[in-house]
A protein has these predicted regions:
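Phosphate-/polyanion-interacting regions in eukaryotic proteins
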Residues: 1-70
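Catalytic binding pocket for nucleotide-activated donors in carbohydrate/polymer assembly enzymes
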Residues: 71-199
Length: 200
């Protein structure tokens, strides 16, 4: 059985890849402190235990239902002093946009990353939170007790975003990445009008 036998499937638990459900648990246990919810399209009744790769911990966390929400515009984030940034199935692309807001970001330890993550520093650009969110309450209490330091973290994140995450700098990153990859090609690329485009 398993991945190598006649029945193919995922071997091992996958609950660790659904951290947004853990934020819902914090909402239920600390109303007013954490405001997390689930959009209707995130929960599919079609996904059964077999498809999730069942284990007891996953079952508990997937049953933790936060309040159902309607999708709000990104500008709604401007009303919060703190933002909790957790991954989805991979790194969430929202972080760059959230950093522009100047709010203090509580960023979950991530198993995946975007191109700018190596430049970020915990306690300088964000408040680090364990992947399990087990220390979220502790970090929230720290931020409330050290409001000035927490606000400064948000300001530094905003300054970082303005310098490194604007349209021009992101385009520069992609230009350099694709140029470096082009140098590694062991062949000359085909060009011409018959391909439907012309190189600049």
């Amino acid at each position: 059985g398993g991945c190598n036998g006649p029945t193919r499937g995922w071997r091992g638990p996958i609950w660790q890849f659904y951290p947004r459900k853990r934020a819902n648990i914090h909402t239920a246990s600390r109303p007013g402190a954490v405001d997390a919810g689930t959009y209707d399209h995130c929960d599919s009744p079609k996904l059964n235990k077999h498809e999730w790769g069942w284990d007891a911990e996953m079952e508990k966390e997937m049953r933790a239902r936060g309040p159902k929400r309607k999708i709000e515009p990104f500008a709604a984030n401007c009303g919060y002093r703190y933002l909790l940034h957790v991954d989805g199935n991979v790194a969430s692309s929202r972080l760059a946009s959230e950093m522009h807001l100047g709010a203090t970001i509580f960023k979950q330890d991530s198993f995946s990353s975007e191109h700018f993550y190596p430049l970020l520093r915990p306690w300088r650009h964000y408040v680090p939170v364990d992947r399990s969110l087990a220390d979220l309450d502790e970090k929230y209490r720290w931020a409330n007790a050290n409001a000035r330091e927490a606000e400064e973290i948000g300001r530094r994140a905003q300054a970082f975003a303005r310098e490194h995450l604007h349209t021009g700098s992101v385009a520069c990153y992609w230009w350099q990445l694709l140029s470096a990859l082009a140098d590694l090609q062991p062949f000359a690329p085909r060009t011409g009008a018959d391909l439907g485009f012309r190189p600049a």
